[in-house]
Structure formats: structure tokens, C-alpha cells
Amino acid sequence: MKSTIFFALFLVCAFTISYLPSATAQFVLDTDDDPLQNGGTYYMLPVMRGKSGGIEGNSTGKEICPLTVVQSPNKHNKGIGLVFKSPLHALFIAERYPLSIKFDSFAVIPLCGVMPTKWAIVEREGLQAVTLAARDTVDGWFNIERVSREYNDYYKLVFCPQEAEDNKCEDIGIQIDNDGIRRLVLSKNKPLVVEFQKFRSSTA
């Protein structure tokens, strides 16, 4: 019994030490220059708006329910609020912290029942796409990295497979499918550059 407890404590300590921020680690900042709160809700908006907006769910291919994570085609649409949560016991989120990401909420959709909200990576049509699927997912975690030190609040999302080296992590970028839907996918060196804005409920 004692050996089981000691082993569990060892795993927790090893995981925590592996992801302690370095002395130069910086907090991820929102558009108000405030650090992102661990477990807080934010809009993730593209720095270059063009004709596209925030992040939301949509159905692609043969999906009936909106299980694919996409970028809105409407530049005025901020998308759905995202909850960023690190398992580390920290009040704020710093660069390269391991993160889970989920949508804050979904509208009730007939025939779909209770929608999953947590992001995952799934192999699909030769791509590794960001989805809300609960099966056949790639084990790993997301993190946030600055794109340029010149712009302290411009960032990219990165996905790291479990037990992979840093050089195996990949950026989250955009792939436009045949229907013009802008899907979030793993993309080598072509990240979607974003900023984070505090989420404010329309009912607040």
C-alpha cells in the first residue's frame, strides 16, 4: 500500500517539476495586458482579421453535430468563449504551460443532445484536426507561445503529443476545406496568430 502511494506521489512530482516555468517564463497576456487566469474564459481572436473572426464549432464532412473546431467566416463574430486550464497549481497561465482547452458553453442543438466541449486532436482525412471528439484522439496537451517578443500579446497555440520531445510539438493553423470551412489543424510553421480577449457574457 505504501509503495503504491509513494509511486503516485513520484508521478505527481515528476509531472510538476517537468513543467515548472523557467526564470525567463512570461505570463500570457490578454488585450488589457492582464495575465490569463488559470481556468479563465477568453475569446481567442485572430490578429489579422481579414474576413474571419473567432473560434467556434461547426459540422464538417458527414457530421450532423458541430464537432469540428473552426474559425468563424464572419470577422465581426468573436466566436465562443474558451476556458484555458492548466493542471499546474498556478493562478495565472505562463508560456508553455500544459493546457486543456474547452468551449465555455454550447447552445442546445436538436438531435445532438449534450455536446462535448473539450478540445482534442483527431486524425482525419490525412490531417490532424482540432475536434470535440471523445474517441480515437491523440494523447497530449496544448500550450501557448509568443510569436514575437516585439509584440507581447501576439501568440500561437501549440499541441504536444504525450511524451514527445519539444521538437515534435506542432503549431495550430488553419486549413480551408472544399466547402470553405476554416478548420483548426496541426500545421508545421504556419500558425494562426491570435490574441486573447476577456469573455463577457451577453447576459451580463
Curated annotation (Swiss-Prot):
InterPro entries: Kunitz_inhibitor_STI-like_sf, Prot_inh_Kunz-lg. Seed, and at low levels in leaf, root, and stem. GO terms for molecular function: serine-type endopeptidase inhibitor activity. Disulfide bonds join 65-112, 160-169. Keywords: Disulfide bond, Protease inhibitor, Serine protease inhibitor, Signal. Residues 1-25 form the signal peptide. PROSITE patterns: SOYBEAN_KUNITZ. It comes from the Eukaryota. Has probably no trypsin inhibitor activity. KTi2 is responsible for most of the Kunitz trypsin inhibitor activity and protein found in soybean seeds. PANTHER family: KUNITZ TRYPSIN INHIBITOR 2, TRYPSIN INHIBITOR A. Belongs to the protease inhibitor I3 (leguminous Kunitz-type inhibitor) family. This is Kunitz-type trypsin inhibitor KTI2. The gene is KTI2.
